[in-house]
Curated annotation (Swiss-Prot):
Homodimer. Signal peptide: none annotated. Its EC number is 1.1.1.25. The gene is aroE. Pfam families: Shikimate_dh_N (PF08501). Pathway: Metabolic intermediate biosynthesis; chorismate biosynthesis; chorismate from D-erythrose 4-phosphate and phosphoenolpyruvate: step 4/7. One of its GO terms (biological process) is chorismate biosynthetic process. This is Shikimate dehydrogenase (NADP(+)). Belongs to the shikimate dehydrogenase family. It comes from Helicobacter pylori (strain P12). NADP(+) binds at residues 125-129, 208, 230. It catalyses: shikimate + NADP(+) = 3-dehydroshikimate + NADPH + H(+). One of its GO terms (molecular function) is NADP binding. The lineage of its organism: Bacteria, Pseudomonadati, Campylobacterota, Epsilonproteobacteria, Campylobacterales. GO terms for cellular component: cytosol.
């Protein structure tokens, strides 16, 4: 049986559960796919050229995580779907010798929400994940605000119709989303007292990090407000990516079931 290689580019990458859940799917569906896929974690030096690495490693597809999602958008031969709007790519697929970029973070995040009746959201951070979330939430009719410590990237959100801030706005928000990398450094993304104020008036604290109780989620738990980590988003975006890797032979719902069973 033919072997195909896949992977996930990131820095850091050792925390990623993507190899676990994708390899479970490649094993489960190998007969239907007609090939055996193997999915590797790939630690990419910050200065690396993603496309060169992808081709050098002979990959058929890959996911892209922190901090490469915006750079991945720039190196694709073709961009499809909502990735065109959000300027960030988390899924790369070799299609007819062209490197095609997709974004499954956007829909993956929305599918992971247990309820869908939020009116507005505050996104902390302005990177590739934040862009994907803002695009999807705007598409779903929410008012979106973005708070970032610097002006970097905020022009994108302004063009999207988001309210942008470099200082914490004095407003209440239903959804407070941590899309920064602070949790990976075991830090809060924002001043503790300011965050407490948002949590006390909010309906859900959501951290894109997964696998441990982050300082962000720990504070929400302490204040007894609903909170959610990024585990379900990871599985949904991975299942949507797997559908692309399988050339749509395996619907994301089937991939999700397998991935959920192992993680």
């Amino acid at each position: 049986m033919k072997l195909k290689s896949f992977g996930v580019f990131g820095n850091p990458i050792k925390h990623s559960k993507s190899p676990l859940i994708h390899n479970a799917c490649f094993l489960t569906f190998q007969k239907k796919l007609g090939f055996l896929g193997h999915y590797h974690p790939i630690l990419l030096p910050l200065e690396s050229h993603i496309k060169n690495e992808f081709l050098h490693l002979g990959l058929s597809g890959a996911n892209v995580t922190l901090p490469f999602k915006e750079r991945a958008f720039q190196i694709c031969d073709k961009i499809k779907g909502i990735a065109l709007e959000c300027g960030a790519v988390n899924t790369l697929v070799l299609e007819n010798d062209e490197l095609v970029g997709y974004n499954t973070d956007a829909l993956g995040f929305y599918l992971s929400l247990k309820q869908k009746n939020y009116q507005n959201a505050l996104i902390l951070g302005s990177g590739g994940s934040a862009k994907a979330l803002a695009c999807e939430l705007k598409k779903q009719g929410l008012e979106v605000s973005v708070l970032n410590r610097s002006a970097r990237g905020l022009d994108f959100f302004q063009r999207l119709g988001c309210d942008c801030f470099m200082e914490p706005p004095k407003s209440a928000f239903d959804l407070i989303i941590n899309a920064t990398s602070a949790s990976l450094n075991n830090e809060l993304p924002l001043n503790k007292e300011v965050l407490k104020g948002y949590f006390k008036e909010g309906q859900l604290a959501y951290d894109l990090a997964y696998g441990f109780l982050t300082p962000f989620l720990s504070l929400a738990k302490e204040l007894e407000i609903p909170f959610q980590d990024g585990k379900d988003m990871l599985i949904y975006q991975a299942a949507l990516s797997f559908e692309k890797f399988s050339a749509s032979q395996i619907p994301y719902s089937k991939a999700f079931e397998v991935m959920r069973s192992v993680f």
